């Protein structure tokens, strides 16, 4: 399954970009990043179908890493070919996008800079795929 991160803002050469790259290199599933301007631009349609859309949103569900892995694993096993992860800019996502998403996820109650959220998402995607592969990286409790 392709993991497609669609993020507002250019990450450029930054410590956050280094973190994203570090975890992206470890992910054995397909990986793609599309950057959009902070304002304007349109979210591209899925490259593959069937697909799922996950919006990173402060009002979303707070999942454990194992719960997140289970969702991705179920989608993969159900034949989903692409999961798109949308990271908004400073103002987040509009209501229409939130309503159209298959899942809303939050990284806790705090508000995170969108560049840091991208690095956190990359780590969680690595962790989820490693859990599904039975890799010892993740430890519960």
Curated annotation (Swiss-Prot):
Extract the InterPro entries matched here.
Alpha/beta_knot_MTases (IPR029028), RlmH-like (IPR003742), tRNA_m1G_MTases_N (IPR029026)
Q: EC number(s) per UniProt?
A: 2.1.1.177
Enumerate the UniProt keywords alphabetically. Answer: Cytoplasm, Methyltransferase, rRNA processing, S-adenosyl-L-methionine, Transferase
GO molecular function terms noted in the UniProt entry: rRNA (pseudouridine-N3-)-methyltransferase activity
A GO cellular component term found in this entry reads:
cytoplasm
Q: Per its UniProt entry, which superkingdom is the organism in?
A: Bacteria
Where would you find this protein in the cell? Cytoplasm
What this protein catalyses is: pseudouridine(1915) in 23S rRNA + S-adenosyl-L-methionine = N(3)-methylpseudouridine(1915) in 23S rRNA + S-adenosyl-L-homocysteine + H(+)
Identify the residues that bind S-adenosyl-L-methionine: 88
Spell out the Pfam families in the cross-references: SPOUT_MTase (PF02590)
Which family does the UniProt entry place this protein in? Answer: Belongs to the RNA methyltransferase RlmH family.
> What job does this protein perform?
Specifically methylates the pseudouridine at position 1915 (m3Psi1915) in 23S rRNA.
How does this protein assemble?
Homodimer.
- What's the protein called, per UniProt? Ribosomal RNA large subunit methyltransferase H
What's the source species for this entry? Novosphingobium aromaticivorans (strain ATCC 700278 / DSM 12444 / CCUG 56034 / CIP 105152 / NBRC 16084 / F199)
Q: What is the lineage of its organism?
A: Bacteria, Pseudomonadati, Pseudomonadota, Alphaproteobacteria, Sphingomonadales
């Amino acid at each position: 399954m392709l993991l497609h991160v669609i993020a507002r803002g250019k990450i450029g050469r930054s410590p956050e970009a280094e973190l994203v790259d570090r975890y992206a290199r470890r992910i054995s599933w397909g990986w793609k990043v599309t950057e959009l301007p902070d304002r304007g631009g349109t979210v591209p349609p899925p490259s593959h179908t069937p697909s799922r859309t996950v919006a990173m949103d402060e009002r979303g569900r707070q999942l454990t890493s194992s719960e997140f892995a289970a969702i991705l694993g179920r989608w993969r096993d159900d034949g989903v070919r692409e999961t798109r992860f949308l990271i908004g800019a400073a103002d987040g996502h509009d209501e229409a996008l939130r309503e159209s998403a298959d899942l809303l996820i939050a990284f806790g109650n705090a508000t995170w800079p969108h560049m840091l959220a991208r690095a956190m998402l990359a780590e969680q995607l690595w962790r989820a795929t490693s859990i599904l592969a039975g890799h010892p990286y993740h430890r519960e409790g």
